[in-house]
């Protein structure tokens, strides 16, 4: 296989970091775009990646990052600005002659989405489609890593969440990275496609609690609660928080981005609305794309929990 250079954005995040590592392991050159120097960026540098620092919303930064790469992975965080960032990225990619862009969207991205972030992702997909670039959209269900955000509750033996009886097949970030790598290495087979991504088995949250209990060897109790109660429990180690406790501080920088709806943040509005989507079946489904494109069977929920046992114990 010939060595090529690929740009990985969001390189200090879950899917971006895994994509960069897998690309390097396969002998490719990786240029990783990061927002700032930190231990995650230093780790990628230690693995051999060229780490560059820049802003998605600065055209000069994006042009410099894309210069000379064969393909790129575009992953924008849950914050305002994705439509502008997509337009800048598409323009710079066309100028640089990039052969393929893999766009991380989400399964809830649709024209009538109530989540502003999800609707923006749908519009960002359309911007890429209009660009004339070879683009592949990925629409994953809930990441298996979402359970790590719930770890304070799980450590307390609880899984109190607002997702009703909806089902999803949790998909690990490293499995999504395998798909990203597979597409970028063979873009002609995938250009113009939109792929929903799932783990191997669907679960309700009661089912997830049952798997947690079995793998961890302790009871994890499921209960349907309100969205705000879940946030409070996430931020307080699974216990009822004291009066005045600010659960939303858990999300740090997300709280700096207000939503179009007064009194809410962009991320909180998204999380609240996709919880309703989950109840309504939007996140349901399963397929074998991790194996057929990524070349490896998707990680089971049991294996993911066992791998991260220390976080849940």
Explain the meaning of each model-derived region.
Residues 73-74, 103:
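Structural recognition of the beta-strand scaffold that forms the well-ordered cores
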Residues 67-73:
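Short acidic/histidine-rich motifs immediately flanking catalytic phosphotransfer sites
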Residues 232-313:
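A hydrophobic C-terminal alpha-helical subdomain
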Residues 48-50, 135:
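Short, conserved active-site loop motifs that form the nucleotide-linked donor/cofactor pocket
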């Amino acid at each position: 296989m010939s060595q090529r250079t690929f740009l990985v954005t969001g390189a200090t995040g879950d899917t971006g970091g895994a994509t960069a590592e897998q690309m390097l392991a396969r002998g490719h050159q990786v240029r990783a775009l990061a927002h700032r120097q930190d231990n995650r960026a230093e780790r990628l540098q230690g693995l051999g990646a060229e780490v560059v620092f820049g802003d998605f919303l600065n055209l000069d930064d994006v042009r410099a990052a894309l210069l000379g790469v064969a393909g790129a992975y575009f992953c924008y965080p849950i914050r305002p600005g994705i439509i502008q960032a997509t337009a800048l990225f598409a323009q710079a990619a066309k100028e640089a002659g990039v052969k393929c862009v893999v766009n991380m969207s989400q399964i809830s991205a649709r024209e009538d989405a109530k989540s502003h972030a999800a609707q923006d992702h749908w519009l960002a997909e359309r911007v890429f489609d209009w660009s004339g670039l070879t683009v592949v959209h990925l629409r994953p269900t809930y990441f298996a890593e979402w359970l790590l955000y719930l770890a304070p509750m799980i450590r307390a033996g609880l899984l109190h969440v607002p997702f009703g009886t909806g089902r999803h097949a949790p998909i690990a970030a490293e499995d999504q990275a395998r798909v990203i790598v597979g597409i970028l290495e063979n873009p002609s087979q995938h250009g113009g496609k939109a792929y929903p991504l799932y783990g191997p088995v669907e679960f309700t949250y009661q089912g997830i609690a049952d798997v947690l209990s079995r793998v961890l060897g302790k009871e994890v109790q499921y209960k349907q609660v309100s969205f705000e109660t879940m946030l409070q429990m996430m931020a307080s180690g699974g216990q009822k928080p004291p009066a005045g406790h600010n659960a939303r501080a858990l999300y740090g920088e997300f709280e700096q981005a207000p939503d179009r709806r007064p009194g809410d943040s962009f991320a909180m509005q998204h999380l609240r609305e996709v919880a309703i989507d989950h109840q309504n079946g939007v996140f349901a489904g399963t397929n074998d794309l991790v194996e057929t494109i990524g070349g490896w069977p998707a990680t089971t929920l049991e294996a993911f929990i066992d791998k991260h046992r220390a976080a849940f114990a």
